[in-house]
Structure formats: C-alpha cells, structure tokens
Amino acid sequence: YYGVQTLAQLLALDKLPLAEVTDYPDVPYRGVVEGFYGAPWSQEARIRQLDFYGRNKMNVYIYGPKDDPYHRTPNWRKPYPAREGEELKVLVNRAKENNVIFYWAIHPGQDIRWNEEDRSLLLQKFESMYQLGVRGFAVFFDDISGEGTKADKQAELLNYIDDHFVKVKRDVAPLILCPTEYNKSWTDVEGGYLTTLGDKLNEGIKVMWTGDMVVATIDKSTLDFVNPLLKRKAYIWWNFPVSDYVQDHLLLGPVYG
C-alpha cells in the first residue's frame, strides 16, 4: 500500500525518475487524535482527514472529541443512537480503505465507579463499537479529578479489558491508555502514579505522553524521564497543532524539531 503511495507521488512529477523504492516507516504508529475541547469535526471533515492520512502514509486515527457526549460523561455507558452509529460506521470503513486503524476512545473517569457493573457497561460499549467495525480501542483518564484518578484501579480496568476483550477478539489493535498524569509538569513522582501503571499494566498496553507540559516539544530528555517509569516506550500524543485553549484564533506555526 505505501509503495503505491510513493509511486503516486513520483507520478505527480513531470517525469518519472529511474528509482528503486525502499519504503518502510521508522515510527510504527503515525496519525492524529481528535481529542480536543470544542465543536467536533464534521463528518465531511473527518472523511477528508482519513483520505489525507492514506495518501501520506499515516496509519492511526483516534476518535475522542471531548464534546461527544457518548465518548465521555454523561453518556459513555450508553450505545450511540442509530444515526450517529451509522456515521461512525462510515468513518470506520473509510479508514480501512485508507489503511488506517480507526481507534475509538472512551473517557469514563469523571464518574466511573470501580465496580463490576461499570466494568461490564464499558465492555458492552466497546462491543457495540466492535459491531460497527472498530478494531482499535483507547481509554482516556485525562483532565479528571477524584475517584477516577487512582492508578491501581485504572491498571486493573485496563488489564481486564486487555485480557477479556482485546486478546479474546484476536483482530483488535493494542489497547491505548491516556493516563491522568500525562505530562511531566503534572507528574507526582513520589506519589507513584506512573510507577504503578508501569508495574501493573499488561506489557502490550500503550501509554500516552505529551512531553514536559500539555503542549510541548518532544525531546530525548522527556522520554528518558517517562520511559523508565512506565517500563515501556511512551506512546507520544504530540499536541501540535492545538487551538482548543485559544478558541478566538488558530495556531498555525510551522513544525520544527
């Protein structure tokens, strides 16, 4: 698939050069998180995005707009209404056409109860998304307070999902966690939150990290800090470009680094 994309790029030139194509990624997961606050993207915008990802060899799209009420509180326990479910199914199929893994994320932390009932409801929600064609799942515990922030409970839940859903299905991508302490400035090392996740989470679960701050350049020092705590390579959520904290204008500076 990616070789064809490279060929298409070469064919866009006036002349096709004599070339040998050796095409493989250095980074296994390359994509975009729709995980901002404010009006979510439209269906048409998402379709354009997925087509763009395919042309440019990006292979992951994570659906998690904060203002989707069925993604987080109050309705994360409920299935999508029929119309919204069909729209998501269209996106899932478009993602497959573009060789993109469509991840659907749930954000239950603000009102989750650490009991069997909520665990069962979460798995039922994931099953409903699986029936729509979703084959990638994420659990977000970012930007919350209270009971939902407990690292041991988060790890217990993620391991249960991994053992009783992801591994059972056999065709689902690795589970992703966005932790509560997802950047260095919010990390209480002595409190042991990240260490607990590193010790207790199943090995295959990916853990997100935004760098030294919420919006930050990703450099070696931040990875040297977090990777030993997580006992795995951090799954980078690079907050660029993001404008949800300055909604009166767009941030359109160049990519650098």
Question: Where is each model-derived feature located?
Answer:
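Short beta-alpha junction loops
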Residues: 67-72, 143-144, 182
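Aromatic-enriched hydrophobic runs in primary sequence
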Residues: 6-15, 43-50, 56-70, 100-101, ...
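Feature activates predominantly on carbohydrate-active enzymes
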Residues: 1-125, 131-135
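Structural preference for beta-strand elements that scaffold enzyme active sites
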Residues: 29-33, 60-62, 99-103, 136-138, ...
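Catalytic-core regions of glycoside hydrolase
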Residues: 36, 125, 144-257
